[in-house]
Structures are given as C-alpha cells and as structure tokens.
C-alpha cells in the first residue's frame, strides 16, 4: 500500500489541470484503501489519465467554430417546431425544440414562454398546504381572474363585476380588501361592494369610450402577487417528494424575496433576467443548461464543449450578445466577413465610404478571395535556414 503523501507527490508532478488532479488524488486514495495499490500501479493510472487528457485536447489550429456550428446545427434539423405543454402540466405552455434554441442564441429580450421554477425552503417544500400559501403570494391575481361576468351599464354609467366566490377563496382575498385596493389605485372613480359584486362609477361622467378604457384598466389591475407573473402550478417531484411551483411569466428579482422561497435553487428560463439579477457568469451557465436541456428533451446528444463555446462567445464582453448580424457576426472586424453573411451591398458601400481596410485574418474573407485559410496547417508559416554558398574569391 502506497502512502498518501507519496500519491500526492506523484499526482502533483503530472501535467494536468488542478481540478483533474484533485479528482484523481481522491480516486487514488479511495482505490488505494480498497485494493492496496503498488507504486507502479499508481504511476500507471496517472500516466493513463495524462494520456487520455492529452487526447481530449484540441489540436492547435483546429476550426472549433465550424465544428461547433456543425455539431449543434445538424441535430437541430431533427427537432420539432412546436410549443408543448410542460411536463404533463396542461395549464402552462413552454417553447421547446428549434424555436427555443433560436430564442436562446438570438438573446431575445422577451422569451415567448417565460417560466420560473420555484423551489421552496425546508419548512414549505414537503407540505402541499404550505406550498399553496407560497404559490398564492407569487401568483399575480387581477379582477379579471376573479370575475365570473363583467358588464358595462351605459344608462347608469357604471362598470359591474360579478366575482366568483370559489376563485376569491382560492386566491386568498376578500371583497373588502379588493375594494380598498381599487380605491387606493383609482382616485377618479368610486367603488361599491354589494355581496360578491363590485360596482365602479367614474366621478366625472364623460364619453362611453373613456368608461370602457377605465373599465379595461380596472379589470387588468393587479390585486396581489408579482407583476409579470400569471398562474402558478404546483407539482410534486417523484424522486425527492418535494413540491415545486412553476409559474407562467417571470419576475426573478421579486420572487427571490418571497417568504418560503429557496433563492439558491430557484431559476428562470429568461437568460437576460438572470444576467441582470445574478450576473453574467450565471447567465453563461443558464445558456449552457437551457440549450442542453432543450437538446436532451428531443433525445439528441451534443458534446457540452460545443455549447460552452457558443455561451462563451455570447457572454465574452460582460453582456449577452446574440449570434447574428445584430450581435457577434455583425460586429466582426472584417468587412468581407460581414458582407458574406448578410446585407452585402450595404456593408461594401459603407466600407468603401470609410476607406476601410480588411486585414484578412479570418476564415470567411480568405475563402471569399481564394486564399489559403488561416486554419490547421494554414496557421503556421515555415521558416527555413538555407545553406549559404561560399563566396567566390
């Protein structure tokens, strides 16, 4: 059996990154206790690890961008183009497949189906009633959500809302609270509550169109919950037995402050919101996770390193940039590369007007003018010392 100190010294000498060294050391200690390894066996394991690590490295001059584009693009052609219901929950729609991939790499400001996955703290996660309490705090509820029927009375210049008692109870509200909330928000109208009926009368009698506009505002007015968040759905995780809340709509900054929510695990599928709240590194991880998850849902396998390269390029400058003419490709230094991508004539005219010079450092511009591309063997230039002829006397 080899001493732990000896194993540590042997691992430290190996040409490996620190994180792999740590993992290798832990494994060797574990196997050493179990199988009582000899020094030669420990060295053989280290040598094999170094060999495998070197095999995994990219060759200098490899066209990694092209390989990543092919590796992500080819499986993407097999994806479906639909919006599906979320994990068997019919109430919430989620964008999957190719539209979701496009949405991520385009760095859209408003995703088509923003969703938050809200995890709960120790006190709330295993009790459905307590999970329901947290869901009520999150779920955005407006008068429209509670209404059974709405009517505009033109003769009396009134807007009448019939409230559904069941929905009212489910939302954890009462009629007095609704009246107080509306009165504090709309000073230009009077509100009367009669049983489960809310009657709104504008203080000034004007045009019917102004009553309609005011009625629309009152209907949409948020009575409780977070802004930009619609309904919530509680599901139970079959593996852990804990309750998880999924929301239609996203307000990541505010949901982290809600009592009962576990802020360390709660997440949203809105990448820009993650960057705003948690920073660019978290957004980079979210891009990788979202693309991987979308691929896996379709049963497609892509090496994570291709996706990491895309995420690195998108977040390189500390802000999220789309891949396309409004982002990375559109900001390329080469005029010819930009012209080869989209809106060719405009790029060429603008470059001619400025008297721009193309250094021809990239792949696209060299292909365009028929030169060898600076990839692989094209990245190196040979320098030779030729034998000099002796001078004639």
Swiss-Prot record:
GO molecular function: DNA binding; DNA-directed RNA polymerase activity
Gene3D superfamilies found in the cross-reference section: 1.10.150.390
InterPro entries for this protein: DNA-dir_RpoC_beta_prime (IPR045867), RNA_pol_Rpb1_5 (IPR007081), RPO1C (IPR012757)
GO biological process: DNA-templated transcription
Annotated keywords: Cytoplasm, DNA-binding, DNA-directed RNA polymerase, Nucleotidyltransferase, Transcription, Transferase
Pfam families, A to Z: RNA_pol_Rpb1_5
Enzymatic class: transferase
Example of a GO cellular component annotation carried by this entry: DNA-directed RNA polymerase complex
Record's subcellular location: Cytoplasm
Cytoplasm is among the record's keywords: yes
CDD domains xrefs: RNAP_A
EC number(s) from the headed UniProt entry: 2.7.7.6
Predominant place of localization: cytoplasm
Chemical reaction(s) catalysed: RNA(n) + a ribonucleoside 5'-triphosphate = RNA(n+1) + diphosphate
Role description: DNA-dependent RNA polymerase (RNAP) catalyzes the transcription of DNA into RNA using the four ribonucleoside triphosphates as substrates. Forms part of the jaw domain.
Entry-linked HAMAP family: RNApol_arch_Rpo1C
Subunit text: Part of the RNA polymerase complex.
Family: Belongs to the RNA polymerase beta' chain family.
Name the UniProt record assigns to this protein: DNA-directed RNA polymerase subunit Rpo1C
């Amino acid at each position: 059996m080899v001493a732990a100190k000896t194993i540590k010294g042997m691992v430290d000498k190996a040409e490996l990154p620190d994180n792999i060294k740590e993992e290798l050391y832990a494994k060797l200690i574990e196997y050493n206790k179990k199988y009582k390894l000899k020094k030669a066996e420990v060295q053989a394991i280290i040598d094999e690890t170094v060999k495998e690590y070197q095999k995994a490295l990219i060759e200098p001059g490899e066209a990694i961008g092209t390989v990543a584009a092919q590796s992500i693009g080819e499986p993407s052609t097999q994806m479906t183009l639909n919006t599906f219901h979320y994990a068997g929950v019919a109430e919430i729609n989620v964008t999957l497949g190719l539209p979701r991939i496009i949405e991520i790499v385009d760095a859209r400001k408003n995703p088509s189906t923003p969703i938050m996955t809200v995890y709960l703290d120790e006190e709330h996660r295993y009790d459905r009633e307590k999970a329901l309490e947290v869901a009520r705090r999150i779920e955005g509820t407006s008068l429209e959500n509670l209404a059974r029927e709405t009517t505009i009375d033109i003769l009396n210049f009134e807007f009448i809302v019939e409230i559904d008692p069941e929905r009212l109870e489910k939302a954890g509200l009462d009629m007095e609270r609704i009246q107080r909330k509306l009165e504090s928000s709309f000073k230009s109208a009077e509100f009367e509550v009669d049983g489960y009926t809310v009657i709104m009368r504008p203080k000034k009698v004007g045009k019917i169109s102004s009553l309609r506009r005011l009625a629309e505002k009152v209907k949409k007015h948020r009575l409780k919950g977070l802004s930009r968040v619609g309904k919530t759905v509680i599901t139970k995780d079959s593996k852990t037995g804990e309750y998880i809340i999924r929301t239609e709509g996203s307000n990541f900054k505010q949901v982290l402050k809600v009592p009962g929510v576990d802020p360390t695990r709660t997440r949203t599928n809105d990448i820009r919101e993650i960057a705003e709240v948690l920073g660019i590194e978290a957004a980079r991880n979210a891009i990788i996770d979202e693309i991987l998850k979308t691929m896996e849902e379709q049963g497609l396998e892509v090496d994570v390193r291709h996706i990491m390269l895309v995420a690195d390029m998108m977040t390189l400058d500390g802000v999220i940039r789309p891949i396309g003419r409004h982002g990375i490709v559109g900001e390329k230094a080469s005029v010819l590369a930009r012209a080869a991508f989209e809106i060719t004539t405009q790029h060429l005219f603008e470059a001619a007007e400025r008297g721009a010079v193309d250094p021809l450092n990239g792949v696209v511009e060299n292909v365009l003018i028929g030169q060898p591309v600076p990839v692989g063997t094209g990245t190196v230039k040979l320098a030779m010392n030729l034998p000099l002829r002796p001078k004639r006397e």
